[in-house]
Amino acid sequence: MKRIYLLFSLLIGCIYLHAAIYNVMDFGAKANGKTIDSPAINRAIEAAAQAGGGTVYLPAGEYACYSIRLKSNIHIYLEQGTRIIAAFPGKEEGYDTAEPNEHNKYQDFGHSHWKNSLIWGIGLENITISGPGLIYGKGLTREESRLPGVGNKAISLKDCRNVTLKDLSMLHCGHFALLATGVDHLTILNLKVDTNRDGFDIDCCRNVRISQCTVNSPWDDAIVLKASYGLGRFQDTENVTISDCYVSGFDKGSVMDGTWQLDEPQAPDHGF
């Protein structure tokens, strides 16, 4: 009986631990759309990770950000009215530098790097990003993405496991809204993506479920399955289910605002 009670107590303790909420405002975030809030958000993520996991909560407001670095056992929740806005790089600050990859020559630059993104994680597990908020990649670009400090993707994940993206809206996402490479057990549910380059790039991934998503990407792939050599090893993409999704090629932003326009006269590689 004592052993059962001890196990029950440990279970409750673990549930309580992982239910801990870390409000980014308590870590110095201003949510005024001007202050760069990624350092405060990263402090909240680090505190949650140090405690074994928890929910990093972003209340309503505008969070100008450079790179947000994910950790294992973290749930990032964007409240209604929350906007994570990718800031334009400055002279002295910007996005994390793209990590070296000796296999660059086998696929383009965008598929070969993950850290030069608004939100990124490498070698992690048990990650959720959810909520009715918006990720707005305003300062992300495909052009000049090789330069230090430049960010070119909204969310990048490499060699991660047990990832859920749910209920988010994403606008103007640079080269990719999501680059998932070598991810096992990935769930993408009820996302609305309105961009003009790639929506979801599912690369060398296994056990993927994509459902109830709207992806507008007039100049590139909406949802694409592939197997590049970005990981430096051969790995198939397998066991993928895509259901109840809507993909389109309307002007960027016009699906989000409900106007559904087809007037944009720009070439695919310009206007970022």
What do these predicted ranges mean?
Residues 8, 17-272:
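Extracellular/periplasmic carbohydrate-active domains that bind, remodel
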Residues 4-13:
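Sec-dependent N-terminal signal peptides
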